[in-house]
Amino acid sequence: MNESIFPHWNSDQAITFLKEWNFSLGVILLLITIILQFGYTSRSMFVYLIKMIILWLMWPLTIILTIFNCFYALNNIFLGLSILFTIISIVIWILYFVNSIRLFIRTGSWWSFNPETNNLMCIDMKGKMYVRPVIEDYHTLTATVIRGHLYIQGVKLGTGYTLADLPVYVTVAKVQVLCTYKRAFLDKLDVNSGFAVFVKSKVGNYRLPSSKSSGMDTALLRA
């Protein structure tokens, strides 16, 4: 490979490079750390989307670096490790796409390609399906309505709703199954505010309906 494109650096040149770019690299790493640490859907959807882009780029960048290491390995041991890491990275990257496509088929939501989690919370509010990622496999989900603003697990979904608009069932879609949560408790705090608790009641191989249906038996369709 042409050394003019990939020049060989000695230790002094590397130290000089770090001295010149140390401040910029520090700022970039600080921003990335803050975004990864505080990027949650319950805080800022914009910051969370940036976080998802950063996480999404990590695997292809890793694959590029491992392939690069295969061409510039220090010895045969490093070459073998670089090839192994390249294979592992590519396999995991392919599995990510396979699982994301399967989840997309189940939900029809682009949140299926979220690199952080394969759990998607789905709630039908007056015929409009909201889909948002949830990090953990919760046994209960909490829906809160505050002066018409709807929140699920602290994540704001929309406005103009009342407690009466809350459905009887909420689902969490996974790659393998669809978990159904049934409303077990509802408490009205005032005219426009209150909350409801949904408890996991059913797990099966289902997909979300493409349109609103009446009744739970028709709302869950076999995949």
Curated annotation (Swiss-Prot):
Q: Which domain of life is it from?
A: Viruses
Compartment(s) of residence: Virion membrane; Host Golgi apparatus membrane
Q: Which GO terms describe its molecular function?
A: structural constituent of virion
- Record InterPro entries: M_CoV, M_HCoV-like
Membrane topology per the record? Multi-pass membrane protein
- Quote the cellular component terms of the Gene Ontology held in the record: host cell Golgi membrane; membrane; viral envelope; virion membrane
Q: Does the keyword Transmembrane apply?
A: yes
> Which regions of this chain are Intravirion-facing, per the record's topological domains?
42-51, 102-223
Keywords, A to Z, come to: Glycoprotein, Host Golgi apparatus, Host membrane, Host-virus interaction, Membrane, Transmembrane, Transmembrane helix, Viral envelope protein, Viral immunoevasion, Viral matrix protein, Virion
Q: Which residues cross the membrane?
A: 21-41, 52-72, 81-101
Q: Name one Pfam family in it.
A: CoV_M
Which intervals lie on the Virion surface side per UniProt?
1-20, 73-80
Q: What else is known?
A: Isolate N2 belongs to genotype B.
Family as reported in the entry's similarity comment = Belongs to the betacoronaviruses M protein family.
Role summary: Component of the viral envelope that plays a central role in virus morphogenesis and assembly via its interactions with other viral proteins.
Assembly state and interactors? Homomultimer. Interacts with envelope E protein in the budding compartment of the host cell, which is located between endoplasmic reticulum and the Golgi complex. Forms a complex with HE and S proteins. Interacts with nucleocapsid N protein. This interaction probably participates in RNA packaging into the virus.
Tell me the HAMAP family matching this sequence: BETA_CORONA_M
Provide the protein name.
Membrane protein
